[in-house]
Design a protein with these regions (language model features):
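Short, flexible, solvent-exposed loop/turn segments with mixed acidic/basic and small polar residues
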Residues: 18-21, 62-68, 129-133
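Flexible loop residues that form catalytic
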Residues: 12, 104, 158
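General beta-strand structural signal in soluble alpha/beta enzymes
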Residues: 9-10, 30-35, 50-53, 78, ...
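Conserved active-site and cofactor/substrate-binding residues in soluble primary-metabolism enzymes
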Residues: 2, 15-19, 32, 36, ...
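N-terminal glycine-/serine-/threonine-rich phosphate-binding loop
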Residues: 1-31, 37-50
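Conserved small/polar residues in nucleotide/adenosyl-binding loops
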Residues: 151-158
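Divalent-metal (Mg2+/Mn2+/Ca2+)-assisted nucleotide/phosphate chemistry catalytic cores
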Residues: 70, 76-79, 90-145
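Glycine-rich nucleotide/cofactor/substrate-binding loop typically near the N-terminus or early
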Residues: 36-106
Length: 160
């Protein structure tokens, strides 16, 4: 079971996002979300906090930079040691113990498009970085990268 109730959602593939988001709200999670994910959650009336509101930094460069921020990566990479938690508190950083992240469809775009600019925009930077940070801190941070795994998350959270 996830110890902390803050989840970061940053997905390109929104398959079943409505169901898992509603489930997380019912389980008393606070959802933080980026760009298109935030727009989607707003459209389906799921309460959440835009990540740019939390970081106090708007998305820049046409959305190329959304999650690359110490308030996000600090919350993912911190352990529950007193030292880390003190530092988070001093910097007003929350713990993220659950991430729901999937990547831009780079390979599909390469197969379908001959336009270099279109292909380049599908090179995911922030998503890969979020995944790597969560993996580095695997003892604390749970990451879901495929909508198929939402059922596993539901089962895990329901059993606790």
């Amino acid at each position: 079971m996830v110890k902390n109730k803050n989840v970061l959602i940053s997905v390109f593939d929104k398959t079943n996002l409505d169901n898992i988001a509603i489930f997380l709200i019912k389980k008393k999670f606070t959802i933080y979300s980026t760009g298109g994910s935030s727009e989607y959650l707003k459209k389906i009336h799921v309460p959440h906090i835009q990540i740019s509101k939390y970081t106090e930094q708007k998305e820049i460069l046409s959305g190329r930079v959304k999650t690359l921020h110490p308030k996000i990566f600090g919350g993912i990479l911190a352990t529950y040691s007193k030292k880390h938690q003190k530092e988070l508190s001093e910097e007003k950083i929350i713990n993220f113990d659950l991430l729901i992240v999937n990547l831009y469809p780079f390979e599909e775009t390469v197969k379908k498009s001959k336009k270099t600019d279109e292909i380049i925009e599908m090179i995911d930077i922030g998503g890969h970085s979020l995944i790597r940070a969560a993996v580095k801190n695997y003892r604390k941070t749970t990451i879901i990268i495929d909508p198929v795994s939402y059922t596993h998350l539901r089962a895990h959270e329901t059993s606790g």
